[in-house]
């Protein structure tokens, strides 16, 4: 999901001549995200609703799916099962308190919330470490 958000945000901000920078931080260590927050760069981060465990759920099958190879040829058609992450949710990570081991986030479902830092990190990792910043 993050690459699509990054691409769309870059196009929009360029059209607005905003000068803002968009970075895809997917794969970043959680501690690196905290450093961004400490630098006054809130981070959009994928985790799960109410920090429940993520489940991969079968969604549908693409029949006769082919990929285009680097030489322009296509792969042998195959059936591709597509899964999605149940209970996935995006938060805006905007602060943290190491003494209390909590993160402070804006949550579109619950408003400003504090969550246990270790659990939040686990959920971030379950969602393939997806994160985006705009500054």
Residues of each region from the PLM?
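A short, Trp-centered hydrophobic/proline-enriched beta-strand micro-motif
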Residues: 43-47
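Cysteine-nucleophile protease catalytic domains, especially the papain-like/related folds used
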Residues: 1-42, 128-135
């Amino acid at each position: 999901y993050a690459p699509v958000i990054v691409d769309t945000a870059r196009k929009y901000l360029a059209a607005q001549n905003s000068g803002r920078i968009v970075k895809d931080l997917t794969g970043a260590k959680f501690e690196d995200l905290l450093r961004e927050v400490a630098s006054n760069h809130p981070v959009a981060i994928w985790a799960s609703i109410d920090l429940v465990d993520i489940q991969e759920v079968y969604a549908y099958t693409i029949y006769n799916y082919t990929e285009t190879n680097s030489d322009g040829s296509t792969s042998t058609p195959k059936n591709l099962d597509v899964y999605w992450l149940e209970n996935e949710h995006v938060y805006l990570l905007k602060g943290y308190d190491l003494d209390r081991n909590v993160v402070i986030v804006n949550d579109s479902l619950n408003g400003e919330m504090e969550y246990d830092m270790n659990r939040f990190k686990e959920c971030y990792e379950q969602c393939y470490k997806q994160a985006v910043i705009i500054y």
